[in-house]
Amino acid sequence: MSDDLRRKIALSQFERAKNVLDATFQEAYEDDENDGDALGSLPSFNGQSNRNRKYTGKTGSTTDRISSKEKSSLPTWSDFFDNKELVSLPDRDLDVNTYYTLPTSLLSNTTSIPIFIFHHGAGSSGLSFANLAKELNTKLEGRCGCFAFDARGHAETKFKKADAPICFDRDSFIKDFVSLLNYWFKSKISQEPLQKVSVILIGHSLGGSICTFAYPKLSTELQKKILGITMLDIVEEAAIMALNKVEHFLQNTPNVFESINDAVDWHVQHALSRLRSSAEIAIPALFAPLKSGKVVRITNLKTFSPFWDTWFTDLSHSFVGLPVSKLLILAGNENLDKELIVGQMQGKYQLVVFQDSGHFIQEDSPIKTAITLIDFWKRNDSRNVVIKTNWGQHKTVQNT
């Protein structure tokens, strides 16, 4: 092969590579400009790979800082929910901070109203689901209900007796959740026509475990209203292994920031929140102000460490065996454990993977999560299917 021919081939290959790189960087630039979660196809989303922003790694210094105007106008709970209520649960010695939006309109051609009830994971809060709740309400045009709350030891939920022994094992969280569900059902949900209510429990991480194990403890009346249970980014085997790394994570996670905006910036910098619009409502709920003007993290996960080994035990087996419809949404390439693999092969639950989301699926991909939940509700609720028949409407033509 002549040198001239080799040179032409090399130049041609270089030009093709340059075009690919240019297109890739342009796509990444447009993605960052949009700063949202692009839609993929159901039931599995295999869109663009994770987008990594460039950060300096220093608190408060990032190429994605919010402006002074934005800092003075962070969103509040009322931008996402219609109501905020402090619910007293004397049997649990708790005053639980709750957020909810009730159905505002009904469909004439359906007999089902979906009620989405959310349970957050450890170290989070009910406002982790704020963007998701808003998307659900928007897409269903007010024809749904959304309930979220702060679990014990989190955000604005308080113990009635500050000096009482505090337990953070799974069973305690479950009893809280069951008590709160009973309150919601009697005071809010049952006000809707009962034949129309289809309740879907959605739990992120630890919340998924709590939803799974709470179901058998619900009253028979309430169990009949549970259409399905959804777990967000939780696999028993992986979760138990991850607990061994929590100490290292906590050592590298600041508990005090100069301001709430610095806290938001830090979580976005470190990709703990990949969608700023979600971070701006979810992160402030995790901090309380100090007299110095700084903010401190409300939940100290180190105090939970004696109870970690109770959180995920037997989760996969119990989830697969639930007698209701089940949905598991995972982020990235999370591997299934044996129980989930067998259950998936047997068609025991629906599996959806968001390749471009971080661990906080409801925050990083609220649009796709909303679409997936709506699809899950529609495909599993037989009351949404109206079968019309012409049986008996046609006269029989007899031969003459």
Curated annotation (Swiss-Prot):
The keyword Repeat does not apply. Signal peptide: none annotated. InterPro entries: AB_hydrolase_1, AB_hydrolase_fold, PPase_methylesterase_euk. It comes from the Eukaryota. It holds the Pfam family Abhydrolase_1. Residues 32-70 are annotated as: Disordered. It catalyses: [phosphatase 2A protein]-C-terminal L-leucine methyl ester + H2O = [phosphatase 2A protein]-C-terminal L-leucine + methanol + H(+). It is an enzyme of class 3 (hydrolase). Residues 114-365 form the AB hydrolase-1 domain. GO terms for cellular component: mitochondrial small ribosomal subunit. The keyword Hydrolase applies. Keywords: Hydrolase, Serine esterase. Gene3D superfamilies: alpha/beta hydrolase. One of its GO terms (molecular function) is protein C-terminal methylesterase activity. Its EC number is 3.1.1.89. The active site is at S205, D233, H359. Belongs to the AB hydrolase superfamily. Demethylates proteins that have been reversibly carboxymethylated. Demethylates the phosphatase PP2A catalytic subunits PPH21 and PPH22. Forms inactive complexes (PP2Ai) with phosphatase PP2A-like catalytic subunits. Involved in the regulation of cell cycle progression at START. PANTHER family: PROTEIN PHOSPHATASE METHYLESTERASE 1, PROTEIN PHOSPHATASE METHYLESTERASE-1 RELATED. Interacts with and inactivates the phosphatase PP2A-like catalytic subunits PPG1, PPH21, PPH22, PPH3 and SIT4. This is Protein phosphatase methylesterase 1. The lineage of its organism: Eukaryota, Fungi, Dikarya, Ascomycota, Saccharomycotina.
